[in-house]
UniProtKB/Swiss-Prot annotation:
CC per GO annotation: plasma membrane
Enzyme class: translocase
Catalytic activity: a quinone + NADH + 5 H(+)(in) = a quinol + NAD(+) + 4 H(+)(out)
Gene that produces this protein: nuoH
Similarity annotation: Belongs to the complex I subunit 1 family.
Single Gene Ontology MF annotation: oxidoreductase activity, acting on NAD(P)H, quinone or similar compound as acceptor
Name of this chain's protein: NADH-quinone oxidoreductase subunit H
Database matches in InterPro entries: NADH_UbQ_OxRdtase_su1/FPO (IPR001694), NADH_UbQ_OxRdtase_su1_CS (IPR018086)
Domain of life of the organism encoding this protein: Bacteria
GO BP, one annotated term: aerobic respiration
Main location (coarse class): membrane
Length: 357
């Protein structure tokens, strides 16, 4: 594979000369964004199928074989729908808000590694970059609610922004703990450090991953990620019985769809981040045949799909929280817990039982 890429790079350099680096970067961006958009589209089908199975029904099964063309039909339908801009809205901000929401969700994938050498930008501060870029999404939500000139949209935006900012703090402390135990913010290095230790030497790699010693932080990260996404059971932002679609209530057509594209792209992002930080990334759970025969990118995909399916399971199983319960959970439970565990890990690393040496 490396020889193939080297050959392509040399051929492109000889043909395009000075412009080749720009063209090559565009090719790499398309190679990440195009499959991501396909994964986002088919995640909607997977969600409807899984919830259908949990409800003892089939889910979408009429459009194409086994309903496989349903996401394409939904996309065509949304493309053909009219985008209505409310008469008394702030038109420029109303149009920009969906773009402000989806751009950070896509930009964060620049530093996500899909293998030991497969990453768009292998930066040393990858963990910090993801946290910083995803924090910008709250601005799109606030702008959408304010520009719509609707009390329901504005209330939904205020709820969303407060909820997202609150749970970002707990997620931030979890990332600090990951930084402490791995000694790096580079996501590739974080994966590699989980493939060492006594259990890894025995071939039981899955016991050397961070999920075991940092199990409470793994759960806090997943639950905080659910709240960050404004998904059930933390979806009071768009509670059907209260404020309908929240900050998206005045949107239609593709502008409405862009908010959902951002949500599902973030579902994949949070899931793959959980896989990289806690579940060993692309490494095999058992370092022996036949597990080692499976390519690393398949292991990465399977683990990420497992975490994504957890989000869907939450939606199908749990009742919605009240807004005050959501804020209490974030501020009075998760933030103190992460601070205490931060101290515990710091002391643990100074003892002879430090497992991260």
């Amino acid at each position: 594979m490396d020889q193939l890429f080297a050959s392509i790079h040399a051929t492109g350099q000889s043909l395009l000369g000075y412009y080749w680096p720009l063209v090559w970067n565009l090719v790499k961006i398309i190679a990440v964004v195009a499959p991501l958009m396909g994964a986002v589209a088919y995640l909607t089908l997977w969600e409807r199928k899984v919830i259908g199975w949990m409800h003892v029904r089939h889910g979408p099964n009429r459009t194409g074989p086994a309903g496989l063309l349903q996401p394409i039909a939904d996309g065509v339908k949304l493309l053909l729908k009219e985008i209505v801009v409310p008469a008394k809205s702030s038109k420029a901000l109303f149009v920009i808000a969906p773009i402000m929401t989806i751009m950070p969700a896509l930009a964060a994938w620049a530093v996500i590694p899909f293998g030991p050498e497969t990453v768009l930008a292998d930066v040393n501060a990858g963990l910090l970059f993801v946290m910083a870029i995803t924090s910008l999404e709250v601005y799109g939500v606030i702008v959408a609610g304010w520009a719509s000139n609707s009390k329901y949209a504005f209330l939904g935006a205020m709820r969303a922004s407060a909820q997202m900012i609150s749970y970002e703090i707990a997620m931030g402390f979890v990332l600090v703990i990951i930084l402490m135990v791995t000694g790096s913010m580079n996501l590739t290095t974080i994966v590699n450090t989980q493939n060492t230790g006594r259990f890894a030497e025995m071939g039981l790699t899955f016991l050397s991953w961070n999920w075991l010693p940092l199990l409470p932080m793994f759960f806090i990260y997943i639950i905080s990620g659910t709240a960050e996404l404004n998904r059930h059971p933390f979806d009071v932002v768009e509670g059907e019985s209260e404020i309908v679609a929240g900050h998206m209530v005045e949107y239609s057509g593709m502008s409405f769809a862009m908010f959902f594209l951002a949500e599902y792209a973030n579902m994949w992002l949070i899931s793959i981040m959980a896989t990289l930080m806690f579940l060993g990334g692309w490494t095999s759970p058992i370092d022996m045949a036949p597990f080692t025969w499976v390519p690393g990118w398949i292991w990465l995909g399977l683990k990420t799909l497992m975490v994504v399916t957890m989000f869907i399971w939450f939606r199908a199983s749990f009742p919605r929280y009240r807004y005050d319960q959501i804020m209490r959970l974030g501020w009075k439970v998760f933030i103190p817990l992460t601070l205490v565990y931060l101290l515990i890990v710091a002391i643990w690393m100074k003892t002879p039982w430090n497992i991260w040496n």
